[in-house]
């Protein structure tokens, strides 16, 4: 009986380690890293609606209204050459009327994700960018994949932009590409 309990404890412990090391266990709007965009849209719909803001065409993105009431907006990215349209980035956004609520939401989600992934996040960082203030925390996985929880506080002069809370799931390769200034 003791051996059975010891084995059970080891198995359960191992499951939490593997869960913490795999970003694909987390879903945004029932979408996860590695799943196919073709499960939602036809190739024609994807190609007609993909974003054109990247100069470097290694990856492509598409944005659409959330499939659930949890988010306002969803953005996903895939390697342009991938005929299966496997997602390498899944981002959910919730528009914010009060930026302080957004900052509180970062703290709430940080606690939930710390427990879910069993990973300690980075310190909260804020820095100005050309559009306003960007505040975020990251959950970094051993694989190099990353979850970013953030708030964009846009300056008043950008009246076409609304402050937004975002959760982004990104693979290591996609993050590396984003950091190479593909715009």
Give the label of every model feature segment.
Residues 20-64, 88-183:
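Non-cytosolic coordination micro-motifs
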Residues 61-86:
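Compositionally biased P/S/T/G-rich terminal and signal peptide-adjacent segments
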